[in-house]
Structure formats: structure tokens, C-alpha cells
């Protein structure tokens, strides 16, 4: 595991979430995030390992590291020259003056909430984000990532070409019960998972994924051989193994399709 010493001048300040804000640095085209509530960095790493054995190709690869003496993770910047990541919240507020969550929650039906988001992005960027939402919400359901919100869902804008493109799957660190204060280690995985309340469409992560359309497929044998048998045992890995067993019918085997 590599260790980095980064100056405070490289700290990046961004909008936080309900879980607080991880200290983030940007240096030499890479993003560095220190753990805040538990083992977010390890979760980012393990989830990206899983995605390397899936049918999702557009995702950010993370590596575990030490940052100024604290555990965390590092990833390459996914933005190209002249590109900016624009969150759904920022885009929605700039066009309507209203928070996207407030607009979405006007609808009582889960499907209608998702459709509102799709149609808003389609109208203002010409992007069909159906596949993006399917990928994101499927990964969240599998990994128990309850901290997805309209400030880490977004699209990418190229200011030179004046075009938009989908963002990759990233920011998965709140999954796998990584917040040890909220999901203490003395509770079983089953007990902790019962306390998961998802975002941003509904509290049930499985329903959120279902109504977005589940397309995630996993090469279970590849993941077993490349990672489960080789990675150091950890709570994050244990939670993922449990979830893969519980959700196997929801996320089919890539080799059998």
C-alpha cells in the first residue's frame, strides 16, 4: 500500500452529505480521500474490484493508500480536458431554483420519481441517463450504499464542444457498512442491513434499483478467483460476500447470459 504526503493547499472543498465530508486532496491528476467514518477507502477499492468482474465498463478504479498517515483511497481523475462534473442538484437548481429532492418527492410513486429525473436530464442535456441510473442504483442495492444523493449523481460537460456525457460509477465508499458508528461491528450483517435507509428516490435500495431497471450482471467465478480467494479478510469483504449470496437472483451470472 502506497503512502502519500500531501500539503493542505491541495485540499478540495466540496458539498458534503448526511455522513459528513471526507477530506479530499487533488494532486497530479489524482483524487485522494481520507477515511472519515470507518473503512470507506477499502470499500471503494473492493467495489471497483467487483465492477471489474461485471458488465459495467464505465467506473472509477480505486486503490487503497495512506494519506498523511491516515487510511484512504486514490483514483485517477476521470475528467478530460475542458470537462466539468455537474451534479444533478446543481443543474436542477440552476434551471428551476428548486432543490431536485424537493421536486422528486412531490411524486408518491417510485417510478414517477425516477422518470422525473430522467426527463429533466433529457430535456436539458439531451442525455438518456436510463443506463446510468440503472448501473448506479444496482451497485448501491448490492453494496448497501445508502448515501447516494443528487450531489454525487451527475453528468459531465465539455465546455469546448458544448456537449454532455454520462459520468462513470464512482463514490461508493458509504457501502458495505463502512460507517462503523452507524453500523457497529458488534451487530450482525443482517441486523445492520435492517437499518439501511436508501436515497435519493426511496428508502428501499432494492426497489430503487428495480424501478430504475436492473441490468447489472456479475462474473461470480472470476470475482471468486481473482479477489475473494486472494484479498485479505476484512469486514468489507465479508459484507460483500454476504450480499452476493443474498442477491444472486437479483444480479445474474454474467457467464450464463
Task: Write out the residue ranges for each language-model feature.
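Anionic ligand-binding catalytic core segments
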Residues: 1-135, 142-145, 150, 154-257
Amino acid at each position: 500500500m502506497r503512502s502519500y504526503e500531501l500539503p493542505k493547499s491541495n485540499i478540495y472543498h466540496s458539498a458534503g452529505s448526511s455522513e459528513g465530508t471526507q477530506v479530499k486532496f487533488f494532486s497530479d491528476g489524482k483524487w485522494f480521500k481520507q477515511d472519515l467514518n470507518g473503512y470507506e477507502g477499502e470499500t471503494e477499492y473492493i467495489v471497483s474490484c467487483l465492477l471489474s468482474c461485471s458488465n459495467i465498463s464505465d467506473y472509477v478504479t480505486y486503490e487503497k493508500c495512506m494519506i498523511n498517515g491516515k487510511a484512504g483511497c486514490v483514483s485517477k481523475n476521470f475528467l478530460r480536458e475542458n470537462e466539468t462534473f455537474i451534479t444533478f442538484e446543481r443543474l436542477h437548481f440552476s434551471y428551476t431554483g428548486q432543490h431536485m429532492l424537493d421536486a422528486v418527492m412531490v411524486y408518491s410513486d417510485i417510478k414517477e420519481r425516477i422518470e422525473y429525473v430522467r426527463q429533466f436530464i433529457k430535456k436539458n442535456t439531451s442525455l438518456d441517463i436510463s443506463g446510468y441510473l440503472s448501473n448506479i442504483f444496482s451497485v448501491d442495492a448490492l453494496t448497501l450504499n445508502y448515501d447516494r444523493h443528487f450531489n454525487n449523481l451527475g453528468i459531465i460537460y465539455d465546455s469546448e464542444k458544448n456537449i454532455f456525457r454520462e459520468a462513470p460509477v464512482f463514490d461508493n465508499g458509504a457501502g458495505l457498512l463502512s460507517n462503523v458508528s452507524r453500523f457497529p461491528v458488534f451487530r450482525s450483517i443482517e441486523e445492520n442491513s435492517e437499518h439501511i435507509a436508501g436515497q435519493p428516490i426511496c428508502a428501499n435500495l432494492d426497489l430503487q434499483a428495480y424501478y430504475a431497471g436492473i441490468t447489472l450482471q456479475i462474473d461470480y467465478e472470476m470475482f471468486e478467483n481473482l479477489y475473494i480467494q486472494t484479498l485479505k479478510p476484512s469486514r468489507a469483504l465479508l459484507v460483500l460476500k454476504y450480499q452476493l449470496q443474498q442477491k444472486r437472483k437479483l444480479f445474474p451470472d454474467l457467464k450464463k447470459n
